[in-house]
């Protein structure tokens, strides 16, 4: 076990030592290093008595953690009184004179409770600020991509609409306002400063781009197609003159042959002459 002496207390309770877990406790002497044994102590909390079984060489801090589960009070908000004296969490029970059936009193420490709540609030504020800075960093990365795209267009001789540049500037300034509302110390303060420097750099770069963009020549508008060029194929074909339209018009007439009614009736009234066969037929009886 690693031990480190850090001085002697003024109360005469002996020197302190550092345990492997990082807890500084009362240093044990050779004559007090007897075999540990279990004891039962009675702890009064308000009007309720709790009987706790614990090792005699445990600390008051370990006793507080056991009492926390039984009473619901946070162990950092407790004060244990033994023989009309408050006992420190780092002190051992046996070295303080605690024996089997000893009586102790547990009270809540309002000052310790307030300190703990303030510390918890500080931790929560730090986490909230860190998350807010992370969100701003994500948005700044996205806006930096737009800035890079505009820089590429203007660098190649193109021109960006002034409205797009103004919108990007407004979004960058909004992120600066959000960042200014975040407060914090340590890592939060360092991260905030880094994002502020980054945003200021992008704002300056955008100002230069706006000046450069204003000097770019105006892009020629696309030519408007004439109405004749927008006609469909069939409309165009209907408007083109055909080869036959250039020649004089052809007049088609019909000559009707008239027949006299008398001649027609005569032709119909003429008898039909029989046709004699050219072959000679032999008749047999």
Swiss-Prot record:
<comment type="function">
    <text>Co-chaperone that regulates diverse cellular pathways, such as programmed cell death and stress responses.</text>
</comment>
<feature type="domain" description="BAG">
    <location>
        <begin position="132"/>
        <end position="210"/>
    </location>
</feature>
<dbReference type="InterPro" id="IPR039773">
    <property type="entry name" value="BAG_chaperone_regulator"/>
</dbReference>
<dbReference type="GO" id="GO:0005737">
    <property type="term" value="C:cytoplasm"/>
</dbReference>
<dbReference type="InterPro" id="IPR029071">
    <property type="entry name" value="Ubiquitin-like_domsf"/>
</dbReference>
<dbReference type="Pfam" id="PF02179">
    <property type="entry name" value="BAG"/>
</dbReference>
<feature type="modified residue" description="Phosphoserine">
    <location>
        <position position="244"/>
    </location>
</feature>
<dbReference type="GO" id="GO:0051087">
    <property type="term" value="F:protein-folding chaperone binding"/>
</dbReference>
<keyword id="KW-0143">Chaperone</keyword>
<keyword id="KW-0597">Phosphoprotein</keyword>
<dbReference type="InterPro" id="IPR036533">
    <property type="entry name" value="BAG_dom_sf"/>
</dbReference>
<protein>
    <recommendedName>
        <fullName>BAG family molecular chaperone regulator 2</fullName>
    </recommendedName>
</protein>
<dbReference type="InterPro" id="IPR003103">
    <property type="entry name" value="BAG_domain"/>
</dbReference>
<feature type="domain" description="Ubiquitin-like">
    <location>
        <begin position="37"/>
        <end position="113"/>
    </location>
</feature>
<comment type="subunit">
    <text>Binds to the ATPase domain of HSP70/HSC70 chaperones.</text>
</comment>
<dbReference type="InterPro" id="IPR000626">
    <property type="entry name" value="Ubiquitin-like_dom"/>
</dbReference>
């Amino acid at each position: 076990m690693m031990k480190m002496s850090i001085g002697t207390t003024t109360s005469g309770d002996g020197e302190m030592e550092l345990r492997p877990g990082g807890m500084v406790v009362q240093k044990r002497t050779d004559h007090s290093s007897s075999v540990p044994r279990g004891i039962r102590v009675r702890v009064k909390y308000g009007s309720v008595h709790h009987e706790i079984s614990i090792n005699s060489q445990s600390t008051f801090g370990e006793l507080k953690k056991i009492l926390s589960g039984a009473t619901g009070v946070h162990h950092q908000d407790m004060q244990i009184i033994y023989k009309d004296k408050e006992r420190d969490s780092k002190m051992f029970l046996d070295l303080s004179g605690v024996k089997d059936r000893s009586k102790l009193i547990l009270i809540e420490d309002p000052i310790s409770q307030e300190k703990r709540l303030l510390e918890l609030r500080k931790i929560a504020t730090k986490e909230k600020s860190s998350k807010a800075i992370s969100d701003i960093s994500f948005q700044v990365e996205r806006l930096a991509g737009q800035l890079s795209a505009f820089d590429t267009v203007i660098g190649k001789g193109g021109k960006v609409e002034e409205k797009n540049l103004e919108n990007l500037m407004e979004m960058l300034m909004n992120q600066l306002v959000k960042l200014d509302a975040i407060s914090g110390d340590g890592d939060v303060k360092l991260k905030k400063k880094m994002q502020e420097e980054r945003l200021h750099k992008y704002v300056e770069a955008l100002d230069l781009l706006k000046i450069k963009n204003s000097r770019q020549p105006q892009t020629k508008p696309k030519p408007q197609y004439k109405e004749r060029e927008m006609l469909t194929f069939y409309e165009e074909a209907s408007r083109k003159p055909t080869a036959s339209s250039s020649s004089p018009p052809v007049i088609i007439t019909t000559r009707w042959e008239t027949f006299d009614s008398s001649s027609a009736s005569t032709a119909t009234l003429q008898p039909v002459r029989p046709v004699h066969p050219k072959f000679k037929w032999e008749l047999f009886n």
